[in-house]
Design a protein with these regions (language model features):
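Non-cysteine beta-strand/loop elements that form the S-adenosyl-L-methionine
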Residues: 1-7
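Conserved active-site-proximal phosphate/metal-binding subdomains
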Residues: 7-31, 35-46, 58-285
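Gly/Ser-rich catalytic serine loop of serine hydrolases
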Residues: 52-57
Length: 285
């Protein structure tokens, strides 16, 4: 089969391109119909398309099953099996899934892969958003409006920023975000001293789990580097995924989830905190 992963509704990394608006989801059917036409033209008429992302009730997709414009078609469930007795995620994680509200799933671009991913909007993601919000442009030699001196780092390295950005930086420092970390985009973000140490340790502990990592600048090439400065606006994905699956507090880690995860709360199947077995879930579907 050929999997069509809805780039707005699927959980985790979902293939949203830079030409698509993360805030304007599109109907998957025209895209799947276009894919089916291409496959049929290539003689793949009998190969099913697997619809992934946004699938909750099979009744919502009944009109697809016999539709020649998309059929043969199958459906993939990624989020619902998380909330089963056999699922290896922690009890806290399962409990949290039962409380999510619509809008709690956040399509974000903090991933070290450089791609969008869909995850629960928890303190982990809010902290990442805060890093990017506390960000200003700088140059190393004064030019134009960027001529106001500001010092960052333990050695007080001099950079030049605009007057308004200098005022922002001074405000953030007064709030406890004392450490300025440079990004590969000629900007600097402000974080606490504790967070700065954590970021730098995670970067130095990189185990090369990605072929290219924006966070650590590791790359699977002869130079072992992307050639860009490590990006402190991101995070170590291997560390956070290992930590959450091994029982760390879910608010402190990345919680991948599909857009429909908020439906756990109001679906009568999960009333009173009911967690089904895989068999019970399949029977329900």
């Amino acid at each position: 089969g050929v999997v069509y992963e809805d780039p707005w509704r699927a959980g985790g990394h979902n293939g949203l391109s830079n030409s698509e608006d993360p805030n304007v989801p599109e109907d998957p059917r025209p895209r799947v119909a276009e894919l089916r036409k291409v496959m049929n033209d290539l003689g793949l008429n009998s190969v099913p398309i697997v619809m992934a992302g946004g699938v909750w009730y099979m009744r919502d997709w009944a009109d697809w099953i016999e539709d020649p414009d998309v059929a043969p078609v199958a459906f993939q469930f990624g989020t619902r099996p998380l909330l089963t007795q056999e699922s290896p995620i922690s009890k806290e994680w399962k409990t949290r899934l039962l409380t999510l509200e619509e809008g709690d799933i956040f399509l974000n671009k903090f991933s070290p892969t450089g791609f969008y991913s869909s995850a629960v909007r928890n303190p982990f993601l809010r902290e990442l958003k805060g890093r990017s919000d506390r960000q200003i442009a700088f140059v190393e030699e004064a030019e134009g409006d960027l001529h106001h001196e500001f010092k960052i780092g333990a050695r007080g390295r001099q950079i030049f920023v605009t007057a308004s950005d200098k005022a922002l930086a001074e405000k953030w420092v007064s709030e406890g975000y004392t450490d300025g970390l440079r990004t590969p985009d000629s900007t600097v973000i402000f974080v606490s001293a504790e967070k700065s140490k954590e970021i730098q340790k995670d970067q130095s502990d990189c185990m090369g789990c990605l072929s290219q990592c924006q966070f650590s600048n590791w790359a699977q090439n002869e130079a072992a580097t992307t050639g860009r400065r490590p990006d402190p606006r991101s995070y170590c994905i291997q560390k956070t995924l290992q930590d959450i699956v091994h029982g760390d507090p879910v608010d402190d880690q990345l919680m991948f989830a599909g857009h429909n995860a908020f439906k756990f709360k109001d679906d009568p199947f999960y009333s009173n905190g009911f967690i089904p077995t895989v068999k019970e879930l399949i029977d329900r579907l």
